[in-house]
Amino acid sequence: TLNGTPIHVSDKPLDQGLFIMGTAIYLREFVKPTMSLTEQLLERSCDYRRFGAATLDLCYIACGRAEVFFEYSLAPWDYAAGAFIAQEAGAIASTLTGEPLPWIRRCSVWLANPANQHVLGELTV
């Protein structure tokens, strides 16, 4: 809940909504793939946001404030709580290769409302 009101992901398609991205800038090998994926998502969305704290980003998806989140490399302490909250609110979580989140190791993270889970399969990751 948020201030006593149950939260839920939005039902907006990405072309009417936002995506949130993380940069993993400390891992230089992910700079170009991150920018490529950002460009692909910008072509399919209204805009994007970059807040800098993955758990906050994932909770924004849970509350319906944005439709999709991705980052190429997050440690479990960066994504586990937020991904769990978002899944409880109706989000679908996976790695960028479509695998289930491992919960115990570093991985890429894709989180989307059900209306946008298909977008992952349309992207060059």
Place the predicted regions along the sequence by residue:
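Acidic beta-strand-loop-alpha-helix segment within the catalytic core
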Residues: T1-L58, R106-V125
